[in-house]
Amino acid sequence: MLIRIVRRLTLDEVKSKIKQFEEEHDTTFDDFEELFLSRRLDRSRVGKYFEWASLVHAYRGYVEGGELDYIIEETRELSPEQTALLTPKRLELLYSLASLQAESINKLAQKTKRNVKNVYYDLKTLQRLGLVVFRRRGRRNIIPETLIEEITLVIR
């Protein structure tokens, strides 16, 4: 089964992609941008410039304001085993996580009227599929977050 996902990138993913661009082009973004602005950049690399620029601007926005906003669309092929993990309860939990403000796994379990242990297990499964991340706040509080903006299952 194919799955089409529109999601936000994590900070680590943005940093990694910026580093990949620097290694691939053997230069910094500022130098690459100078080539673009002075019209000395090869036409085949213009698309790369815009992608790199949007990553750098998103990262700089994060540094200045603490909010990272970079959205990508990707298509993944799920194995039959992975497809089986997308149960109705887990998809419902993913939807609830996106629409409810949950300060912890306990609060999410309360809001969805489910057992905390089952919610935690389902969140860990969704994390392995790359649909959920956990953010630690304080010493004990773990906050589940979804990076998913949109998900489409393509059955073929």
Regions found by a protein language model. Give the residues of each.
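DNA-contacting interfaces and partner/effector-binding or oligomerization modules
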Residues: 1-43, 48
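Short alpha-helical segments that sit at the start of domains
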Residues: 64-92
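Short, cationic-aromatic polyanion-contact patches
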Residues: 79-88, 104, 136-156
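Short amphipathic alpha-helical interface segments
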Residues: 88-102
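A short acidic, leucine-rich amphipathic alpha-helix
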Residues: 107-113, 126
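Residues within the DNA-recognition helix of helix-turn-helix
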Residues: 122
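A short, conserved structural fragment
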Residues: 128-137
